[in-house]
């Protein structure tokens, strides 16, 4: 059995790879491992709007109850809400049934520990080992020792909305905002939060039917929202993904504003408020060099991690940083939540637009995005480190870096899943970096022939 857990829990095509049987086993093993020692453990369960959610929830909950834990089912709710509410309700763990931005046929199961953090690799491995060993050593409970399922009646959604609203001071009166809910988990929470804060709210893609989640909508397909914002003269647009742990924005001119710009704007604002700990933001190696240049001008440091919000969070926790995130719109505000939170991000941005009295596009001028080129070089899995060993390749990378002279960069990343090495170049001249990236990729391919 290969590793069951990916970078974001267990994912697969529902009923084919992620079966009801596997969901039952994950519920049973997860509840047992995460609640050892608790008298009558409590586990919070939420999901996004996918049709397969009901099937997987039933199986997952059966597994949880079989080891004597209580399952508190809160229904459709954003992933970051489960992270927050697990802490608020003093639950022993939280579980979300969601495949985030993936198409409807996929689903996933993701655990949070009692502090609202995603599980460490070690805990995930313990859960997998227990399943592999066919639950050896896990007692079979009967009678009064079996757990109960508790259906929650809407209080969880209310608590999460109140929490999200509390992350900004004042209101959003006078702001005209368009929201794209991706027919996903934020279709109630984001709309209510913005309305209750006094914004004029326009909404698209907030009628989930079980199969339209992420379909030509949300943060992975923001084209309709870009058009809508301009047509309806909105001050800004905000696009969530299926489980609302990420958010991208649209300025009043219809331009897409990615996570790099959001980090730049929010980082500057936090610094102004004296809340940017150690004057540092945490980003990944894929963040545009334009962000580094912009932050240098603001006297803000950027620390880079591997790609993946879990690595961003790891770095933030290690050094107590206040904000970090990815281009994709996964933004973590450690003062507020333990994971990327689309609604919290959206509210921070909207609040800055209102408070600063500038248009959103003016705020975005803080940063100039450098052209970026990504070329894949086909390389056998056992030779993916050739760019670190071969002298000619190393020399070519050094030459390109020298010629870019601080206004560009070369980044080589082996793919974690395919026989590829990704060659990424950034610089001021699109044509030039395009040529350089292709010739470097070709050199790498020729070396492994």
UniProtKB/Swiss-Prot annotation:
**One GO CC term, this protein:** cytosol
Cofactor(s) essential for the protein = Mg(2+)
Tell me, what is one Gene Ontology molecular-function annotation carried by this entry? magnesium ion binding
According to UniProt, the reaction catalysed is: alpha-D-glucosamine 1-phosphate = D-glucosamine 6-phosphate
Keywords on record: Isomerase, Magnesium, Metal-binding, Phosphoprotein
Q: Which gene encodes it?
A: glmM
Give the highest taxon in the source lineage.
Bacteria
Q: What name does this protein carry?
A: Phosphoglucosamine mutase
Name any one Pfam family assigned in the record: PGM_PMM_II
Q: What Gene3D superfamilies does this protein map onto?
A: Alpha-D-Glucose-1,6-Bisphosphate, subunit A, domain 3, Alpha-D-phosphohexomutase, C-terminal domain
The UniProt record lists the keyword Phosphoprotein:
yes
Provide one Gene Ontology biological process annotation. carbohydrate metabolic process
